Amino acid sequence: MLQGAANSQHYKGTGPGGNQRLRYRIWILSLLVCIPAIAVAFAYFDVPVARRVYGILGSAESLATGFASAVLLSIEAAIVLALVILRITRGRLSPFREATVLACLTSICAYAINDSALKFFFGVPNPGAMFHGASHAFNLLGGSARCSFPSGHMVLAGAFAGVFMRLYRTSILPLSVLLLVAAVLLIVGDWHFVSDVIAGAFAGVSAGLLAGELWLAHSNGASRD
């Protein structure tokens, strides 16, 4: 269903091997920057920032309900279902709609892995639990879906954005701004620590970029056959 994307001018850019190596090196550099940034934030900024911003948004329960992960996942699933039905009835989708399907599926999968594996592995209590006496520390292999590290919201949003960042280069700046706004809201809303959103954004965007890269390689390979 997604092969029409390969013919779109927006999707050019797998490039020669040199470009792929450059992108890989940029990702490695980003990883090397993010790891110490997460460590420093976890040790020195998470708790002080959480205490400083506590209650700034007042009662954000309605906002939290409206943007709960289950709601966002349901919206993405509904979009995928609608576009699949459209593909069946019309025989094709525009490249942008195909990219949307890929972005939604990548986002859903990345969120599931984060919620069922990464949060369980790291086991960091969320800010609400910390304010009720929990220690802000890693509890390896002792976590649950209610833990906060990495941020599921940022993984969800980052994976969706990462696909479009790879397939539509002009979307990089606006999507980066939106991710930054989302990260700030998650911190100010007492849902996540600084380290949570950094780790979640990196993991999510990485998943999206990888999905876009693999799709481009698959599409270009299919077009040569």
Question: Where do the language-model regions lie?
Answer:
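N-terminal transmembrane-helix/juxtamembrane module of multi-pass inner/ER membrane proteins
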Residues: 2-82, 119-141
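Structural signal for the C-terminal ends of transmembrane alpha-helices
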Residues: 10-15, 81-93, 165-168, 210-216
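Membrane-embedded catalytic cores of phosphoryl/pyrophosphoryl-handling enzymes
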Residues: 17-25, 29, 135-225
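Residue-level signature of transmembrane alpha-helical entry/exit and packing/kink sites
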Residues: 27-31, 95-103, 197
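Aromatic-anchored segments of alpha-helical transmembrane domains
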Residues: 36-43, 107-114, 179-191
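Alpha-helical membrane-inserting segments
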Residues: 41, 46, 81-84, 109, ...
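Transmembrane helix-loop junctions in multipass membrane proteins, especially transporters and channels
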Residues: 47, 51, 88-92, 123-128, ...
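Membrane-interface loops
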Residues: 51, 94-166, 170-171
